[in-house]
């Protein structure tokens, strides 16, 4: 196993080591990702449960509002809507959770919601029954009043000489007072559903029925009318009892809903507490798993680092010893290499390098003698070459000086033409920039003109709408005047009614006061609308003048744009001619510089040739000296 690992490549060794670390790191990341996903899911579930609790709170508030509103249809619809929202959230949670404990709680919660809905429907039926009972009481009271009115008219129509006429009328008035007291007691019972109020209302009804029996004895001729009155009072009593039963049903439903609501809250809190406990358990598991995976990754990483380091550093140390021996001149060693990885290939290369160096040193010894004899011959030839190169250098310097002066003159012309071209280009750019600015100004002014036109139309529309508001205010003013008259008439009628109409008179005075304040506010609004219409007209006139000035500005900007276009065209022509002049001068300058460079190159070559000849002569002497030194150095190697 160790031999196999030693023979695989360093890339593969490092790849295996880092690969194991990366795999464990990936597993660690996967573990963290999975744990994080579980926590996120748990948080989402807790959020859903929080939404369920919010829906429950909304439902309980809606139920209280429904009870405060005494069974109002709008409040009932709102309560049903909140109950449906709560039920839908519960059904959604039932499809989301898979744990048996959660599913059981959600199932129990669903059953409680169904029972809660039944109780709510019973309460609605109770409120519907109370409304029906009140309608029945009102209709029965109206029939009883009508019977008493007809009976009173018949009694009052009798001759004044009738001795029993006054006594019969007093009995009828007493029965009417009894009926009025019954209605007052029933209203008190409706306002406060207490047993005492209920018994008081029923006792008063029984008293009214007893007076009816007395009337039957006193007025046997009016038995039909009295029977109608008695039937109406009996129906009124039945309606009161229906109201009592409906109130009892409402009270029972309220108690049931209170218990069911508390049960829903308890189960919802239990469901939320379960999620908290599961979250804590999953957090602990995630931390433990992360710690184990981290320790395992660190352990494997350390082991891989130690093993790979030993497989790489030991052969490197052996190779370093061999290289140091070669550096010290000892070429007698022979390395034995068995590894087949990159380090083995390196050791084999160093072994071949030692063999090659031995052969090289042996060859150098033989070549040093030949170099010494060749150096003497080279020195003689170099002296002749140096004399000819010095003569050529003098002639080339004279030609180079003349060409340099001509090139300087041509470059001056080219610079002047180029400066003129740059100036024309700058003028052309400025003219084009001015043209663009004018174009943008024209566009801005045209858009301003369009905005002014739209603003004028908007002001006209505002003026029309303010006129419509004026007509609406006339209607409101007329309605306020009519309300004032109606309130005045109601106050007069209430005054005629005396003590019984005092409360109605107070209400009529309040309505009249409201109508007068409405009329006064309407007049103030009319004044504001008139001021608004006047200001709107002034703004519209001013915007018409601004629109005319804007159109004139657009025309002037267009003329300025045309002038800038002409200037731009002229500057472009000047720029084109300057560019042609500059191009011609640059071509002449380039030709002159090319000739000058060629002559300078010739001169440089001559100088280099002369210098090379001198150096060659010196090198020949030096070469002979180096040959001796080389023989001395080669003798240091042991082969």
Curated annotation (Swiss-Prot):
Domain HAMP: residue ranges: 310-362
Q: How is its activity regulated?
A: Binding of citrate to the ligand-binding domain reduces the chemotaxis towards the strong attractants such as malate and succinate. However, in physiologically relevant niches, citrate is mostly complexed with magnesium or calcium ions, and does not bind McpS.
Q: Which residues lie on this side of the membrane: Periplasmic?
A: 35-288
Cytoplasmic side residue ranges read 1-13, 310-639
Question: Which keywords does this Swiss-Prot/TrEMBL entry list?
Answer: Cell membrane, Chemotaxis, Coiled coil, Membrane, Methylation, Transducer, Transmembrane, Transmembrane helix
Per the similarity annotation, which family is this? Belongs to the methyl-accepting chemotaxis (MCP) protein family.
- Protein name, please? Methyl-accepting chemotaxis protein McpS
Write down the species: Pseudomonas putida (strain ATCC 47054 / DSM 6125 / CFBP 8728 / NCIMB 11950 / KT2440)
- Gene name, please? mcpS
């Amino acid at each position: 196993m160790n031999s196999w690992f030693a023979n695989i490549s360093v890339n593969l060794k490092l790849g295996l080591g880092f690969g194991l670390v990366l795999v464990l790191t990936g597993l660690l990341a996967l573990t963290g990702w999975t744990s994080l996903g579980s926590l996120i899911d748990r948080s989402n579930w807790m959020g859903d449960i929080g939404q369920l609790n919010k829906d429950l709170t909304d439902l309980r508030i809606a139920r209280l509002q429904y009870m405060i509103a005494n069974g109002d249809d709008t409040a009932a619809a709102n309560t049903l809507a909140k109950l449906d929202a709560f039920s839908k959230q519960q059904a959604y949670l039932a499809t989301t959770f898979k744990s048996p404990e959660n599913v059981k709680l959600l199932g129990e919660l669903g059953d409680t919601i169904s029972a809660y809905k039944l109780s709510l429907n019973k309460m609605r039926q109770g409120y519907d029954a109370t409304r029906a009972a009140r309608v029945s009481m009102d209709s029965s009271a109206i029939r009883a009043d009508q019977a008493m009115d007809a009976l009173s008219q018949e009694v009052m129509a009798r001759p004044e000489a009738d001795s029993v006429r006054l006594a019969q009328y007093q009995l009828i008035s007493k029965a009417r007072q009894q009926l009025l007291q019954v209605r007052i007691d029933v209203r008190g019972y409706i306002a406060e559903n207490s047993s005492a109020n209920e018994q008081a209302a029923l006792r008063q009804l029984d008293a009214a029925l007893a007076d009816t029996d007395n009337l039957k004895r006193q007025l046997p001729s009016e038995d039909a009318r009295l029977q109608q009155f008695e039937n109406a009072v009996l129906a009124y009593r039945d309606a009161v009892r229906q109201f009592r039963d409906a109130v009892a049903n409402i009270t029972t439903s309220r108690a049931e809903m209170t218990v069911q609501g508390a049960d829903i809250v308890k189960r919802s809190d239990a469901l939320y507490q379960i999620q908290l406990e599961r979250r804590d358990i999953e957090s602990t598991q995630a931390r433990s798993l992360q710690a184990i995976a981290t320790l395992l990754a660190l352990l494997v990483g350390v082991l891989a680092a130690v093993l790979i380091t030993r497989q790489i550093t030991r052969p490197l140390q052996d190779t370093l010893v061999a290289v140091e021996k070669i550096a010290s001149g000892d070429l007698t060693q022979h390395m034995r290499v068995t590894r087949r990885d990159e380090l083995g290939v390196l050791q084999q290369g160093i072994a071949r390098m030692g063999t090659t160096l031995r052969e090289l040193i042996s060859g150098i010894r033989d070549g040093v003698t030949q170099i010494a004899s060749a150096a003497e011959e080279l020195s003689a030839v170099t002296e002749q070459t140096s004399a000819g190169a010095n003569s050529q250098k003098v002639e080339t310097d004279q030609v180079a000086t003349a060409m340099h002066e001509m090139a300087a003159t041509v470059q001056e012309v080219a610079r002047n033409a180029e400066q003129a071209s740059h100036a024309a280009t700058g003028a052309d750019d400025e003219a084009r920039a001015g043209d663009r600015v004018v174009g943008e100004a024209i566009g801005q002014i045209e858009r301003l003109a369009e905005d002014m036109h739209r603003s004028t139309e908007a002001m006209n529309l505002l003026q029309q709408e303010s006129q419509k508001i004026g007509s609406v205010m006339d209607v409101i003013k007329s309605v306020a005047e009519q309300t004032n008259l109606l309130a005045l008439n109601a106050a007069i009628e209430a005054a005629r009614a005396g003590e019984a109409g005092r409360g109605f008179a107070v209400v009529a005075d309040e309505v009249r006061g409201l109508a007068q304040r409405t009329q006064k506010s309407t007049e103030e609004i009319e004044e504001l609308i008139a001021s608004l219409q006047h200001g709107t007209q002034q703004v519209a006139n001013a915007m018409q003048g601004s629109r005319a000035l804007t159109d004139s500005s657009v025309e002037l900007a267009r003329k300025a744009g045309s002038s800038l276009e002409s200037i731009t065209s002229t500057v472009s022509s000047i720029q084109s001619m300057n560019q042609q002049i500059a191009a011609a001068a640059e071509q002449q300058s380039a030709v002159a510089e090319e000739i000058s460079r060629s002559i300078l190159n010739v001169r440089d070559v001559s100088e280099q040739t002369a210098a090379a000849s001198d150096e060659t002569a010196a090198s020949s002497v030096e070469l002979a000296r180096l040959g001796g030194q080389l023989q001395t150095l080669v003798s240091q190697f042991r082969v």
